[in-house]
Curated annotation (Swiss-Prot):
EC number: 5.3.1.1
NCBIfam families cross-referenced by the UniProt entry: tim
The protein's role, per its UniProt record: Involved in the gluconeogenesis. Catalyzes stereospecifically the conversion of dihydroxyacetone phosphate (DHAP) to D-glyceraldehyde-3-phosphate (G3P).
Molecular-function GO terms, alphabetical: triose-phosphate isomerase activity
Family designation: Belongs to the triosephosphate isomerase family.
Residues annotated as catalytic: H96, E168
Protein name: Triosephosphate isomerase
Organism encoding this protein: Streptococcus pyogenes serotype M6 (strain ATCC BAA-946 / MGAS10394)
Catalytic class of the enzyme: isomerase
Subunit structure: Homodimer.
One annotated GO biological process: glycerol catabolic process
Gene Ontology cellular component annotations, sorted alphabetically: cytosol
Residues annotated as binding substrate: N10, W11, K12, G174, S214, G235, G236
Length: 252
């Protein structure tokens, strides 16, 4: 079945509110129809209000880069999924390797966040991916499969069909190394196969799987030609309006 592509930029800890607004103003009027592709940017928490406000009359969707799994409480420094929904966010990125690595987030944390995100009417973009050691040991499929199963445990089939999975090999994030087209296809298919095993083929056929890891305007078309790659989660190339728009040239 045909799945609508989704291109999402992850700004990470970059841009102040003025820069975020300028970016949205530069790209908003130039984006293709939502019939063709969903386009989103994941802004830092400090930029979300500005980014959502600037994007509100356009087709650009806005993601948060993280949230907590409780709506309110004594959780200093955390972001409420309930408030993200009230602000007008569309997506929340969870399970990014930087969160797992630097902030010691576990599969259980990510699963709780996925449930909280759905409970508040938002859509999770659930990241998964292996280290270079795991890849070179030939254990990538097994490792990433376990991440996906754990992250989605206890969700309904309907919820899983509607979310986004982002496969990002850790060795390709910000390193300039990128997975080959075959690597990307094989791993995104492996991710989809886990969904099929856990939730059935119909759900697996609906869920969108992105590839991430040094995706650039020069290579996005190759990745998007893969039958099991439904989009891209893009870091560095999403920081400039020109290169972000150029990522959408794969449609032509």
């Amino acid at each position: 079945m045909s799945r609508k592509p989704i291109i999402a930029g992850n700004w990470k800890m970059n841009k102040n509110p003025q820069e975020a607004r300028a970016f949205v103003e530069a790209v908003a009027s130039k984006l293709p129809s939502t019939d063709l592709v969903d386009v989103a940017v994941a802004a830092p928490a400090v930029d979300l209000v500005t980014t959502i406000e600037a994007a509100k009359d356009s087709v650009l969707k806005v993601a948060a880069q993280n949230c907590y799994f409780e709506n309110t409480g004594a959780f200093t420094g955390e972001t409420s999924p309930k408030v993200l929904a009230e602000m007008g966010a569309d997506y929340v990125v969870i399970g990014h390797s930087e969160r797992r690595d630097y902030f010691h987030e576990t599969d259980e944390d990510i699963n709780k966040k996925a449930k909280a995100i759905f409970a508040n009417g938002l859509t999770p973009i659930v990241c998964c991916g292996e280290s270079l050691e795991t890849y070179e040991a030939g254990k990538a499929v097994e490792f990433v499969g376990a991440q996906v199963s754990a992250a989605l445990a206890g969700l309904s089939a309907e919820q899983v069909a509607s979310l986004v999975l982002a496969y990002e090999p850790i060795w390709a994030i910000g390193t300039g190394k990128s997975a080959t087209q075959d690597d990307a296809q094989n791993m995104c298919k492996a991710v989809r196969d886990v969904v099929a095993a856990d939730f059935g083929q119909e759900v697996a056929d609906k869920v969108r799987v992105q590839y991430g890891g040094s995706v650039k305007p020069e290579n996005v078309k190759d990745y998007m030609a893969c039958p099991d790659v439904d989009g891209a989660l893009v870091g560095g190339a999403s920081l400039e309006a020109g290169s972000f728009l150029a990522l959408l040239d794969f449609l032509n």
